[in-house]
Amino acid sequence: MHHVLRPIAFRLALVSPLRSLTITHHHLFFTKRTMASSARTYNDAIDALNSLQTPFAVIEARRKAGIRPDAHSVKEMRAYLARIGYSSQDLDRLNIVHVAGTKGKGGTCAFVDSILTRHQRTHGIPRRIGLFTSPHLIAVRERIRIDSKPISEELFARYFFEVWDRLETSQLAKDEVELGSKPIYARYLTLMSYHVYLSEGVDVAIYETGIGGEYDATNVVDRPVVSGISTLGIDHVFVLGDTVDKIAWHKAGIMKTGSPAFTIEQVPSATQVLKDRAVEKGVDLKILDVDPRLNGVKIRPDAVFQKKNATLAIALAETALKKLDPSFKPGTDSLSPEFVQGLEQVVWRGRCEVKEEDQAVWHLDGAHTVDSLKVAGRWFVEECVKKAKGGPKVLIFNQQGRSEAVDFLDGLCNTVKSADPEGTGFSHVIFCTNVTYATTGYKKDFVNHQYNPKDIENMTQQRVFAERWSTLDPSANVMLIPTIEEAINKARSLVDTTEGEQKVQALITGSLHLVGGALGILEKADAL
């Protein structure tokens, strides 16, 4: 069904009339009985966690008032840490590998985790490996991993409520934060991760920052084993600033006196800021070229950006192992088998991931910046050329709540067109919300109170995307579809079954929340 939407003057297919989506913002209330019950479940924990999300109205008011995270944010985290029974000195036992960056920080952390896991299997060191990342793809508990596996629902619930109860009853640091209060969603999970890892005997923990570094919730660690900064670019402009050098200042905040730090080649202005901050902090910062020992190592995807991530990961893993394993000696001319296996066999869901089925080949990448979307576009075309299955090229895209995201589309559209041997780009472009299912809405782990529910119901952001794409490529069939499930089903229906081996070639990108929802639908279960 085709409708012309006014005042937008372009052809736009509207699939499944825009019914009213029920986006429930249920800030949950927990009775004394419920919260004290010994049978508190994973679902109870997720409900309680969701109640800690900052509502859209509060976020918008802060934005208009120009209120940004500052040094007080870290001071509050230290107060909450004290309330659950720990000090920053206790975190030294975790031998933290701390990673910040705009692009590739999650992938770098995954590489480090994979390398350390292979070393552990061969040498028995480290004893237990923690990995803390964000956001989650499918289930909240995947943010807190031990030995490469998300902690179980039972462990998550147990440790979640141990932290909750301590925060309810502790009388410590009453001048810093209100008694009985809890940190907001992401900070709570960071706080909980420290409790999990210290309780479970983890002896090395890899921490990915959330936003920035200097004022990030993870920046309560005073003595990381090593710090790493991946590729820098423009992201989270309101919080971090609108230039790469401003953003570099924030990211450099994770560097600590007495701990080595590494980064990779950056744009000159960012490099200078990192160097200046290293001098200010008395940190030995090394800037790495792509590691020559990667020659012959099968990095996926085989691209410069991924080799940079691998280079940084090698330096971080080697530094950690020098402290943890007295017998460890880094290879000078080549990497050890454990390092090669760790790099080649890493699993990092939702990044350059391909899933194939009868009707479609799904290419999923959680790219969400201008540069990373260009990389995702090139990778998609390369994969399509390799498979040579023909079929329509379909884009499923969303980036919710960021007005600047519309400008990301230009680079993606132009990159795919120029890389495509046929020069045609996407024949169909679908813009959807992050609502997962057509009938039941969100899975609990995906509930997000931080966006304007009216904007989601009216598909306000998606209409802006559609208008821009129709200007960029008037030949594309542009569609608005309310949910991820319906977007996937629509893409499947676009294959021409009379053309034999043809399959839809679909790229799902723009947001890890979108990619996570898509993986859950495609696999019909938790994709953990």
Curated annotation (Swiss-Prot):
Binding site for Mg(2+) 2: 236
Top-level EC class: ligase
GO BP terms in the entry: one-carbon metabolic process; tetrahydrofolylpolyglutamate biosynthetic process
Catalysis: reaction(s): (6S)-5,6,7,8-tetrahydrofolyl-(gamma-L-Glu)(n) + L-glutamate + ATP = (6S)-5,6,7,8-tetrahydrofolyl-(gamma-L-Glu)(n+1) + ADP + phosphate + H(+)
Gene: met-6
Gene Ontology CC terms, in alphabetical order: cytoplasm; cytosol; mitochondrial inner membrane; mitochondrial matrix; mitochondrion
Free-text remark on how the cofactor is bound: A monovalent cation.
Family indicated by similarity: Belongs to the folylpolyglutamate synthase family.
Pathway(s) where this gene product acts: Cofactor biosynthesis; tetrahydrofolylpolyglutamate biosynthesis
Source organism superkingdom: Eukaryota
Name listed for the protein in its UniProt record: Folylpolyglutamate synthase
Required cofactor names: a monovalent cation
Principal cellular location given in the protein's record: mitochondrion
E.C. number: 6.3.2.17
Binding site residues for Mg(2+) 1: 134, 208
Key words of the record: ATP-binding, Cytoplasm, Ligase, Magnesium, Membrane, Metal-binding, Mitochondrion, Mitochondrion inner membrane, Nucleotide-binding, One-carbon metabolism
Phylogenetic classification of the source organism: Eukaryota, Fungi, Dikarya, Ascomycota, Pezizomycotina
Any GO MF annotation of the entry: tetrahydrofolylpolyglutamate synthase activity
Keyword match Nucleus: no
Biological source species: Neurospora crassa (strain ATCC 24698 / 74-OR23-1A / CBS 708.71 / DSM 1257 / FGSC 987)
Biological function: Catalyzes conversion of folates to polyglutamate derivatives allowing concentration of folate compounds in the cell and the intracellular retention of these cofactors, which are important substrates for most of the folate-dependent enzymes that are involved in one-carbon transfer reactions involved in purine, pyrimidine and amino acid synthesis.
Binding locations of ATP: 104-107, 351, 365
Subcellular location: Mitochondrion inner membrane; Mitochondrion matrix; Cytoplasm
